[in-house]
């Protein structure tokens, strides 16, 4: 009886915590579809009484946003592929106990987690490499994340060495072992870290502001910020972007949040199984 009561209390607490996490996002979605009067009169909306697409029409009324979506998709796909390729190769090398200089290299990796190069030095390096106003400026400076690298390294390190020894007996070299044995066995970790990198690239904001001067190359996050600024009357007017009078600023902000968040949420269910397993194994074996 006591155990059942305890379980009910735990489930009740978890349900309440889940509602606290989910309700704000439901409010954001509902408010983005609500009418002007409802947004102004109500503080919290779960289901709009009258659906309105004015905010979304306003956001998608210009071709610029479609270009920005393509830019974000390109940066996310290419950036994730580059980051996973470089991170997995480096993590595999650091996971080998026979690697000469392994400890000093690991120290340098951990050091970058505590002390970064700084905004201005990084900008000067990007400028000297001729990457300003280039999509690669959004990818290469952050291609390897030290935290993600350590997770992959710990995962690779726990793969039984007997598998590698058997592969070597069969004539497999190091690259063959990596691509044919290590990577297939590491799909949960690969899926987890890929999602981490993809979310980071999709939310690219500060680096785009620093390195991109051409508005035609803006990713979706920067353009949505500009739409919010224009709609609130802080600078310019929307006629320059090919749109008429805007709906209320509150609904535009809510619609912007939905547009920026939904793509990531659509990807997550397809890798949920691998993501949960990879996160669990990383926490136990790390």
Swiss-Prot record:
Q: What is its main location?
A: membrane
Alphabetical keyword list: Cell membrane, Membrane, Sugar transport, Transmembrane, Transmembrane helix, Transport
Protein biosynthesis: is it a keyword of this entry? no
Share an example GO biological-process annotation for this protein: transmembrane transport
Where found in the cell?
Answer: Cell membrane
InterPro entries recorded? MetI-like, MetI-like_sf
TM helices/strands, residue ranges: 9-29, 69-89, 106-126, 131-151, 176-196, 251-271
Q: How does it sit in the membrane?
A: Multi-pass membrane protein
The record lists its disulfide bonds as: none
- A Pfam family found in this protein is BPD_transp_1
- Show the Gene3D superfamilies listed in the entry: MetI-like
Q: Name one GO cellular component term.
A: plasma membrane
Domain ABC transmembrane type-1: from-to ranges:
69-271
Top-level division of the source organism's lineage: Bacteria
The Swiss-Prot or TrEMBL record describes its family as follows: Belongs to the binding-protein-dependent transport system permease family. CysTW subfamily.
Q: How does it assemble?
A: The complex is probably composed of two ATP-binding proteins (MsmX), two transmembrane proteins (YtcP and YteP) and a solute-binding protein (YtcQ).
The protein's role, per its UniProt record: Involved in pectin degradation. Part of the ABC transporter complex YtcQP-YteP involved in the uptake of polygalacturonan and rhamnogalacturonan type I. Responsible for the translocation of the substrate across the membrane.
The name this protein carries in UniProt is Polygalacturonan/rhamnogalacturonan transport system permease protein YtcP
Organism encoding this protein: Bacillus subtilis (strain 168)
């Amino acid at each position: 009886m006591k155990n059942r009561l305890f379980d009910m209390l735990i489930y009740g607490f978890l349900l309440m915590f889940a509602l606290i996490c989910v309700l704000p996002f439901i409010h954001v979605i509902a408010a983005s579809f609500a009418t002007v009067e409802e947004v102004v009169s109500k503080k919290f909306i779960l289901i709009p009484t009258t659906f309105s697409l004015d905010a979304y029409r306003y956001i998608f009324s210009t071709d610029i946003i479609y270009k920005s979506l393509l830019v974000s998709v390109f940066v996310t796909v290419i950036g994730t592929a580059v980051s996973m390729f470089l991170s997995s190769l480096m993590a595999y090398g650091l996971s080998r106990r026979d690697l000469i200089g392994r400890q000093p290299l690991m120290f340098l990796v951990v050091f970058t987690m505590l002390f970064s190069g700084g905004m201005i030095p990084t900008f000067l390096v990007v400028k000297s490499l001729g990457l300003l106003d280039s999509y690669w400026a959004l990818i290469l400076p952050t291609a390897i994340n030290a935290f993600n690298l350590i997770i992959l390294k710990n995962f690779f390190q726990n793969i039984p060495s007997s598998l590698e020894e058997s592969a070597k007996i069969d004539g497999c070299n190091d690259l063959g072992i990596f691509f044919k044995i290590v990577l297939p066995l590491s799909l949960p970790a690969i899926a987890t870290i890929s999602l981490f990198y993809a979310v980071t690239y999709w939310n690219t904001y500060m680096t785009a502001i620093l390195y991109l001067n051409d508005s035609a190359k803006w990713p979706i996050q920067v353009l949505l910020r500009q739409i919010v600024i224009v709609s609130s009357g802080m600078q310019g007017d929307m006629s320059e972007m090919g749109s008429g009078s805007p709906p209320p600023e509150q609904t535009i902000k809510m619609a912007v949040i939905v547009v920026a968040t939904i793509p990531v949420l659509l990807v997550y269910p397809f890798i949920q199984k691998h993501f949960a397993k990879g996160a669990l194994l990383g926490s136990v074996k790390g």
